[in-house]
Amino acid sequence: MAIPFNPPPESLPSQSSLEELLDFDWDTVESIADDEGWTWDDNRGAYFEGGNIVSPDRILSVTRTRMDGYQSQIRSVSNDLTSGNISVSEWERRVAEITVSVALIFFLLGMGSRSKITGDDTEDVKDRLRLQFDYLRNFSEEILNGDLTVGRLSSRAELYIFDAQNNYSLGQEATHSASEYPFYSNVLGSTMPCEQCPRETAKGIVPRGELISIGQRICLSRCYCSFWYYRTQNESQVQTLPLIGIKDGWIGVRVPLRAM
């Protein structure tokens, strides 16, 4: 039986102390697109590199590499806590800092460019982060109460960066207005998806609002799927996934990116 982790007792600082992490400037947020040499084309609603569209597979590959690094950071912070090198208060602050960083980086990636981010977009991002701060404070209190094992603590901490990464999808939704891009399709982001994600992909190009939101499926915040947006429903789907039912499971055949 796993033994609960019991840190030394302490009083947590006011949760409002995390509010200063939301005093950010988009001009200083790291741009994955700039790092990769991608340029956003507003007319096409997509990134381009060397004259070619940046495929969902390429974006996914870069995303996974980045997320591996952020997971390592979270694991290191949690290991510092369970090894007695930092307090719960210090752990909470560092997890919050990483979460904010990931959220901003991926929202910017989803938007395409800093110039497109409005004040309302910024407030939406801040509100989502404040909600994560609420969850994080409850998490910290559970740790201090000795309610969690080391393994459970570490795996649960990683969920914060996966939730933050979902800001990419939120940025994509914001930058593709429903009036200009009234249709979308699901792009599968995993070779071992939950049962819902392939089904959403197989629905094809559908009106906005007809697919289950990313982060609300069985795989929850660990979903790597994304949406691809279209001006008309008769465009070539960026990724198709024919499905053949086998008992309660599904087999999918993935088709490469098509020319747009």
Mark where each language-model region is.
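Domain-core detector
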Residues: 2-222, 228-260
